[in-house]
Amino acid sequence: MLYQQIARNKRKTALIMVLFVVILTLVGAGLGYLFSNRPWMGIIIALAGSLIYLLIMWQNPANMIMSLNHAQEIQEADNPELWHIVEDMAMVARVPMPRVYIIPDPSPNAFATGRDPNHSAVAVTEGILQLMNREELEGVLGHELSHVRNYDILLSTIAVVLVGVISFISGMASRYIWFAGGSRDSDDDRDSNAFEMIFKVVAIVFVLILGPLSASLAQMALSRNREYLADASSVELTRNPQGLISALRKIENSQPMKQADRSSAGLYIENPFHNHGLSHLFDTHPPTEDRIKRLEQM
């Protein structure tokens, strides 16, 4: 059951990443059509923009995210117990020892970030250290180091880049349509046939509405899917689903965080603001009860 869940989640992740690229390509094509009647030019701009943005984000994402969440780096002497648990779980996961941070917040939570296993970092709140025993901490840190081992930290960075580029393209197209009236010149309008007008309307709707909406939904689906995978991988590392189950219940019943950055919400083991939508489509995390049910089946 455990390995079947891991394999299924990896397949879902691959499909979601393909969907991201398809959405980006279609949005780029729509942009190229609206601006110059050359869809291929828009596709090149979208892909090149994504690559440039990714290279910028690649430099040092961990430091930026830790700063946004008010996390403070520690050494072994500052908290030997936490340090040794992270060290032990990193050894079991066969990843390099990440940098360790503590967030001064009484609500229990944790997250991992970085660009790859060699440049990773984990952060836990003061609340999680106070409320959880070693078994529960191992479950939580096993989950976070699974994100590192499974390259979820890289996937989340790529997802942020793709959503950012799609949103930028949508905003640029919106301004163009507002100031230029959505057409290239009056002669084009007189000469355009019904099919061309239909294509133009479809391009506008997709670039301005459906593209950004689809990208956001794909990003949320990716985040939820990687949480399931990290849960399963944590059990693979600890051989003890009860530790993570108990930890998730404590986090679910806690107060929202005060120090968390909203743009980083998807990185945490559980939504730090405890706000869940009715449909769950825009949730960054799966429902806690669903996660616990899956863990109980392992």
Curated annotation (Swiss-Prot):
Chain segments annotated as transmembrane: 15-35, 39-59, 153-173, 197-217
A single Gene Ontology CC term: plasma membrane
The record's free-text note on cofactor binding: Binds 1 zinc ion per subunit.
Superkingdom of the source species: Bacteria
Record bears the keyword Oxidoreductase: no
Needed cofactors: Zn(2+)
Single GO MF annotation: metalloendopeptidase activity
Active-site positions on this chain: 144
Signal peptide limits: none
GO biological process, one term: proteolysis
InterPro entries registered for this protein in UniProt: HtpX_protease, Pept_M48_protease_HtpX, Peptidase_M48
Entry-linked Pfam families: Peptidase_M48
Record-listed Zn(2+) binding positions: 143, 147, 227
Topological relation to the membrane, as annotated: Multi-pass membrane protein
Major enzyme class: hydrolase
Key words of the record: Cell membrane, Hydrolase, Membrane, Metal-binding, Metalloprotease, Protease, Transmembrane, Transmembrane helix, Zinc
Subcellular location: Cell membrane
Documented EC number(s): 3.4.24.-
Similarity field: Belongs to the peptidase M48B family.
Protein name: Protease HtpX homolog
